[in-house]
C-alpha cells in the first residue's frame, strides 16, 4: 500500500488514547456527548460504574436520574431512562446519542442492590440474592465488565461479605 501523506512529528509526542479507569462522566456525557474536556486531554476510553449505573431499573429500583445538578440538559434523558430495564439499554442510548469516547462499565453494586431491595439496610434474603444474581448475569450478558461496589456509600455499605461473594460468583462465570 502506498503512503498517502507523511506527517512530520519531530519534537512531538505520539501516544495512543488514554483510558480513564474510574470515570464519573455519565451525567456530563448526557449534557454534551462530545466530552470535550476529556477528549482534548487525550482520554478516548472511559470506564464507569463505580457503585452506581443508571441501568437497569426495575424491581425495587425505581430508577430516576437526578437532574438537580445538571438541570434541563439531563431532563431530556429522564423519560428515556425509565425504559432501561437492562444494563445494555443505557450503553445503547449513549451509542445512539453519538458520545465521543469509548465506553465500558461495571454494573454498580448499589444499582444491583436497589433492584432487589432498594435502600433497605438489612442483610439480603435468599429471594433478594436470587434477584441480584439474575440481574448480574443479565448485565454480564449485556457487556458489563463485572460489578463495582463503593462500600462507604449507601446502599453498597449495607451489603455483607456473603452477598458480595454471591454476586461475584456470578461474575466469575463470565
What are these regions (language model features)?
Residues 11-13, 132-133, 151:
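Short hydrophobic "helix-edge" motifs at membrane interfaces and signal-peptide entry regions
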